[in-house]
Amino acid sequence: KPRPQQFIGLM
């Protein structure tokens, strides 16, 4: 499950 913090890293 991708965490919200990982999403920020993608951006």
Swiss-Prot record:
GO biological process: chemical synaptic transmission; neuropeptide signaling pathway
Chief site of localization: secreted
Signal peptide start-end: none
Protein's cellular compartments: Secreted
Ribonucleoprotein as UniProt keyword: no
Presence of keyword Secreted: yes
Keywords: Amidation, Neuropeptide, Neurotransmitter, Secreted
Modified residues (Methionine amide): M11
InterPro entries per record: Tachy_Neuro_lke_CS (IPR013055)
Gene Ontology cellular component list: extracellular region; synapse
Family the UniProt entry places it in: Belongs to the tachykinin family.
Function text: Tachykinins are active peptides which excite neurons, evoke behavioral responses, are potent vasodilators and secretagogues, and contract (directly or indirectly) many smooth muscles.
Protein name: Substance P
Source species taxonomy: Eukaryota, Metazoa, Chordata, Craniata, Vertebrata
